[in-house]
């Protein structure tokens, strides 16, 4: 029975994919997995690719297990997707992992890489005291709910004027990620709502 299940999983993991997915979410979850050799339960990263196909339906493209999340491993995943027939991704929604955009563009040079806005907000709020988190979160909302990238840049400057003295790390963190933030503002509200977060992947873990 086990061999039959493993064969089925292997077939699923290597199945052919559609030639194009308008949106692909890429993220990693830290989960406890029992090691096959040591029989010990260890924390490992499960890498996930979740696609939204041309019919608007969500489809898990693959799951990969590794000891830690890293851009090098993501490159191998992108190559795996391409080898299975996925030729084009319009928008890749990712977390803030360093080197992630480069890994995606190595396999898909024309893909728009969009950072997960919610991930960036959560990272920002970690710099804040508990009592300030609500008001800082409201101020950050002025950035990502701006009408366009110019309005967003002004909102970021206004945020830094107001909060930069108390929390000097937040605005620079947004600026470092800015090239992967600004594609967001080119899309209509309906698309923004979809690509705002990689929570679609996190929900698979529940």
What spans do the regions from the language model cover?
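RNase H-like nuclease fold core
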Residues: 2-94, 98, 102-110, 200
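Inter-helix linker motif
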Residues: 108-126
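Metal-dependent DNA phosphodiester-chemistry modules and their immediately adjacent helices/loops
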Residues: 124-154, 158
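Acidic/histidine-rich catalytic cores and adjacent linkers
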Residues: 145-206
